Amino acid sequence: AIVSSDEATIEFAVNLGPDHAQLDPTGRLVAINTGTLVASVGTASIVDTGSKPSGGAALNWGRWEGPGSTIAQQLPNGAVVRNDGGNLHYIYGVVASELPTAGIVEYAPVGGTRPTDSATGEVGNLVSGGRVAVNFTIAQVTLNSLQVGFNNATYTMGGTASLLGPLFSTGGAGATATCTGSACQP
């Protein structure tokens, strides 16, 4: 699962069972406890939900919106960041039984949540899903030309990340972002 509620908090979790992630009967994430991230949807709305099954695997996504949720994450330095009532984006999947072990495969987005501004909560739009290329030979993923738009600001993002243990990491300088428009924020 990948869960994020603001620019400072993103959580990658693997092999989450029912003790750590709770789903409602339709497969929407309603609570998660990874040890460093503890969140519950409470009375907040779950929006932008979707699912894409394929070949025995499936991706599922959604976003919590509005007051009523509790979201707390402990950062590596021990500080706890709270974003109660904020947007929480999630994506989780059933692992595919067959994946390539070598070569490069390009993927196109099949769906997802609308982007949100972590400072204001404004909901934007996906302008372009870009391209995702996975190099299975060297365990690397590259994102090209993902664009999200807000009122008077369009952000274009890209970058390369390598697999470090079970997680992808940009290694500090692997991501780039630009913005056009009068409302661009750092």
Locations of regions flagged by a protein language model:
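Mature soluble binding/inhibitory domains
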Residues: 1-186
